């Protein structure tokens, strides 16, 4: 049996009949909550950085790129 045949057999055995049921499964399995709760949780986030935190949260590639740029300036 090929991969396609086994996938087809799995699909048939699942009892799903297509996209219509797939969408229903997604909606049923989503966690409870609504948009007003999401807005409340987002408003509680603290996005202000304390002084000095900005450098620690950058990507390592960004930090190394800046360090290489500074090294090139010093060599000039």
Curated annotation (Swiss-Prot):
Residues with Blocked amino end (Thr) modification: 2
Keyword Amino-acid biosynthesis (UniProt): no
Molecular function per GO: cAMP-dependent protein kinase inhibitor activity
Keyword Disulfide bond assigned: no
One GO location term (cellular component): cytoplasm
InterPro entries assigned: cAMP_dep_PKI
Name of the protein in question: cAMP-dependent protein kinase inhibitor alpha
Organism name: Gallus gallus
